[in-house]
Amino acid sequence: AGGADISIATIPVGDREAPEFGILKANEENFITSFIEKPKKEILGEWTSDTGAEMQRQGRHYLASMGIYIFNRSLLDTLLKDEYPSATDFGKEIMPNSIEKYKVISYQYDGYWTDIGNIYSFFEANIALTDDIPAFNLFDSSKTIFTRSRMLPPGKISGTTLEKTVVAEGCLIFASRIETSVLGIRSRIGHGTTVVSCYLMGNDYYETLTQMEANTSKGIPKIGIGERCYIKNAIIDKNCRIGNDVRINGGMHLE
């Protein structure tokens, strides 16, 4: 783009996210002038860029690298074969020095993109699907999301109050209340249970009645969440077994 040797896809981020990314600084023509890998919060003020009025209103003043690069082909050959023949990481080894030697431009992406490289961002990205009109909208027919099709029965829900909840196919839900949560395929939640701000990854299979009885005799809970539980701010892994009368209140205080 713009006669550049290298184009880097960037996305505006805020104060909280910036220390987790490689941050680029761009001039008025969007050419990148400097780069820092995962800057400390104390020096963030030195790394702001003009991200546009809307992004700045949202407090997103920093250009984070998305790890997507477009190279002039001949330059790429030179970089890999001659200048950095033993390099193994574009972001850490090749890009910082290339910014000083070549024309490197920022392509600012303003659509939906999020890094889910840590537990908090992974949790936030999934819970955001429960918003009325989420940034990543699964119901946008012009941007269809395709997944592996499964021949599962429809979900069964009984006696449950649902508020801002996304329910995948094949679920068996008998909980008292579920709010601001995402329930993966084949999720099972027992009577009297409350689930708040949780992501349930679901299950790979259904247990048969025979399997349930055999496991109960050994003191092994059924797959899913049992009865009279209270689960909040949690990520429940696939095929997880949570027995009856369990209370889990997750969050930052557990770190």
Short names for language-model regions:
Residues A1, D5, L80-E83:
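Conserved, well-structured beta-alpha core segment at the onset of a catalytic domain
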Residues G2-Y69:
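Conserved core of the sugar-phosphate nucleotidyltransferase
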